Structure formats: structure tokens, C-alpha cells
Amino acid sequence: MLRYIIPRKKGTFVIAAFLTVAFFCIVAYHRNDRRRTKFQFPDIEKYAEELVRLPETWNGELHQIPNYTAPREGPGEKGKPVVLTGKDAELGQADMKKWFMNVHASDKISLDRDVPDPRIQACKDIKYDYAALPKTSVIIIFTDEAWTPLLRTVHSVINRSPPELLQEVILLDDNSKRQELQEPLDEHIKRFGGKVRLIRKHVRHGLIRAKLAGAREAVGDIIVFLDSHCEANHGWLEPIVQRISDERTAIVCPMIDSISDNTLAYHGDWSLSTGGFSWALHFTWEGLSEEEQKRRTKPTDYIRSPTMAGGLLAANREYFFEVGGYDEEMDIWGGENLEISFRAWMCGGSIEFIPCSHVGHIFRAGHPYNMTGRNNNKDVHGTNSKRLAEVWMDDYKRLYYMHREDLRTKDVGDLTARHELRKRLNCKPFKWFLDNIAKGKFIMDEDVVAYGALHTVVSGTRMCTDTLQRDEKMSQLLGVFHCQGKGSSPQLMSLSKEGNLRRENTCASEENGNIRMKTCSKKAQFNERWAYENKMIRNLKSGKCMSTANLKPGDNAIVVECDEKDEHQKWNFIDPAKA
């Protein structure tokens, strides 16, 4: 790709020079070895794709923070999308496959671009006493990240952070191999006059241990972790520092705005969310609870959140290590965000979102680098999550094993140090966390009418209700399938005391003879309420009963007129492990 080797402002001259040199090299090569077969002139685009990007050499001038009040023109300015056409579009789509983001579009955007400010006026009106606030180390971990997304992260932090509050930016290179991230990166950061420190690890640590390494190197009173494909927005740092200065045990997060992985469009708004979790131990976004809405007296107040997404957070550096940092035996990435969330709340701290602080993040559909852990472990999220379940979830770890029965007996390393940490910090039980912080979290096997694999047996053939691997984040029809046993999570169902036939987050309703699973209402609607009588599952609104009549595995479940003599309508909730 010529974009990697040709500076934009010198395009015509450099192309001519490149082709001239290539021509004479080919002639010399051909003349010096007549024994070779006839030489084929290489395809210039294909050849260029093999070359590494050579960023422009630093000219010795120190970085100047842009005047964002002045008009700016150029691709992507003000967060506008970069829409590619023709050959550019082809290169961009190739990047989507390689990088899971459009690096070609990113390369057209200034490293110092302006982005829309989503803050409300009340946030902008807050005055901060910089002299009274602690200084911050911003830590950015990267491994073989694309050049412009990485550098735009750094530039945005430098450009939009008060110098009085920014102690340093630590770039921690987790064993990158790409040439442009070697000497060219060393050269690029010189323009920041020592404000940016580059620390290199020559053995892969993985994100979790690399964050710990960065935190140990930091000298600021506050540490902020950012992913390597972010853009800090206007006024992002001040409210974070102020909150941690006010409350030492608060671990806080900015509001995370979305940057398109394809067009690099910046989408920021004032919608407020909190973090939740699934019993499979994945992070989820949730709306603000009624209790939290009432607690907050003004729109600039911090938001208490049960969990955090993980990539972007800030903490008092001393407190971060006092409360246990990260579990150093967790591998690469995954699970550490819920582990620190549960631990912070249970051990006397808090997790909070700061509505006046915004940072954009490129959400990618995959990882362009190796995510395999030690001993060739390709399930690092699973094994990391088991470590947190065993240490922090008490008996509620059973709910994790409902989803990951395969990990129940798996060795995930020594947990002694983490158990001792919990004891030393005098942390509360996980039930306290559920009762006081994650209120309303549905527990499928606790305080319900019935729970288990919902199955029926007809002529010796057993079938269970099943999600059929459909995306439960969207409204989907419930299906039936052969009972899988061993706690197969897609087949687990509960009947709540409110009459909801439900899974963790979705409830069943009768719809045109089928059963639709959709996000549960706060108060069950009449068509979402069911009764379990005489082994029959009856919808209270339609009066019809769930049936497998004339169904085969993989079909959608149906409701029909109730008939107590029809064995297709007889259902049992049975122990998931025996289903």
C-alpha cells in the first residue's frame, strides 16, 4: 500500500523517484544474473503492501497543542465519518479483515483532529482548582497496534489534558514486533518533550499483567488506563481527578463514546448507563436504576455502577495496589473488569461513572493480535472468570458453572494469594453485593416457583426448550431441541413468583402461536405471565399451553389449546445436570 511509504504532501515527486529507482534496480539485477528466467516486473501495489509503514521523521520541533476554537478542515474533523470510495474503499475493507477497523480511513485523519463535545453546559461551567488537585499518569498498553489509532490516542490525551494535572503518559509496549512501532515510535514521541515515556517489554505480558507493570512504573498520584485506540474528549481529565481527590476509594470510569470501526465517526451523547454482568461473567450495559436516579441530585453527579467495562478506568495509585490491583495470575485479557468491580465494592470501595468525562473508543469486532494465553490456552476469558468466581462469588459461583460446566474441575492456578487478600481486607460476602449493589439481579434458581431444564418426553423422545443459540440481546422465538444435559445453559428456564417464564434477562410471551423471548419488563405484562399446573405451562392471557406437537428438534416452540390428556403438553423442570 503506497499509503505506508509515501508522505501525502510529496506524493507525485516520491512516486516518480520510487519508480525510477525500482526500474534501475531491476535492470541491474537482470544484467548481473543472465542465468535466471525472464524477470517479471512486480505489481507495484502488491509490492508496496509488503513494506512497512515509515512514518515521517521528527523534525525537532516540539508538539504544539492545537487551537480547537479556530475552524478546522480535513477528513474526520469534528468526528465526521470518513467515507472511502474506489481503491481506497478496497484498502479499507482489507483493513477491516486484518485490523478489525479501517486503518486506511484512520490514516487520512489528523492525529490532532477535533471531536464533538457531548458534555452538557453544567459540566463545562465547573471550575477546578488545578493547584489543589493531584497529578495523573495516563497508561496506554499496546501490542502491534496500528500506527494512527495509537498515536491519535496519545495526541488526544496531550491536547486535551491540563498540563498542570498531567504528570506523564506511559506507553507500554507489550512486545510489539512491527517495525513502525520500534525506532519510528521512539522518534515520534520526542516531540512531546519527555511528557510521554515509552516502556518496552520484550516478553509478552498480556493486557492484565502489562497494566500492572505500567501502574508500577507510574509516578502520578492517580493512574488512568486507556485502550490504545481511544480519543480523549474535551475536559475529560478534570472531573476524574476531582472525584478521586474527593473520594480516595472510588475507582472511576469516563463515559465511553463510540468511534466507528469503519468510518472513524465519533458518536458522543448524554445518555447515561451503568455496568452489569451476566452469570456467564460477561459485562453488560444497563440503564440507571430508579434508586440511583433518585440519589443523584444534579446531572453532573457521579453514577454508582455495579461493574465497569474494563478498558478505561482511573484510581488513586496507592489505593489501586492496596485493594489488590489486578489478579496477576489472570492471563491476557477478560474477566479482570468484573473481578476488580466485585472486589472494590465488597472491600469498601466503589465503581463509578463520571458523566462530565468522555472518552471515545473504537469498538472492534475482534482482536488483530494473538489472544492465546499460557500453555496454549485459547479460553483465557473462561479461566480468568473461574478464578474470580472461586475467590469472590461464594456459593453463587454455581451460577457461573451453569454456563461453564466444562470448567468446573479445570485447574486455573493457585488462588491462595487472592483468598488471603480477601481475608486481609475483611471483604463482605457476595450476597451483600447482590443485595446492596447489584439489586434486582435475577437469580435463576433462588426464590422461584421452578427452575431447571424444561423438558417433555413423548414416545420415549426427550426434548427441552432451547434458545437455539439465537442472540438473546434481541427479541427471539424460543425453540425446542434434544435435551443436552450437563447444565446446557441455552436450555435453562425459571418460573418466577411473578409468573414470568424466563431466562436471565429475557421473558416469554405468547405471540401468534409461538413463544417470543424478549427483555423482561419491570412489571410483567399480562401476556408475559404463565402458570405451571398439572405439569402444563399455560399463558394467562391467551389461556393456551406450551406444546411440542408435530415438532422436531430445531423447530420453534408453540402454544395450542390446552388438553390435559396431550402428552406433548406435559413439562417438567429437572435438575440441569440430569437433563
From Swiss-Prot:
Residue numbers spanned by region Catalytic subdomain A: 133-243
SUPFAM superfamilies linked: Nucleotide-diphospho-sugar transferases, Ricin B-like lectins
Keywords: Disulfide bond, Glycoprotein, Glycosyltransferase, Golgi apparatus, Lectin, Manganese, Membrane, Metal-binding, Signal-anchor, Transferase, Transmembrane, Transmembrane helix
Protein name per UniProt: Probable N-acetylgalactosaminyltransferase 9
GO molecular-function terms, A-Z: carbohydrate binding; metal ion binding; polypeptide N-acetylgalactosaminyltransferase activity
Organism taxonomic ancestry: Eukaryota, Metazoa, Ecdysozoa, Nematoda, Chromadorea
Bilayer disposition of the protein: Single-pass type II membrane protein
Biological role stated in the UniProt entry: Probable glycopeptide transferase involved in O-linked oligosaccharide biosynthesis. Glycopeptide transferases catalyze the transfer of an N-acetyl-D-galactosamine residue to an already glycosylated peptide. In contrast to other members of the family, it does not act as a peptide transferase that transfers GalNAc onto serine or threonine residue on peptides that have been tested. Some peptide transferase activity is however not excluded, considering that its appropriate peptide substrate may remain unidentified.
Ranges per topology, Cytoplasmic: 1-12
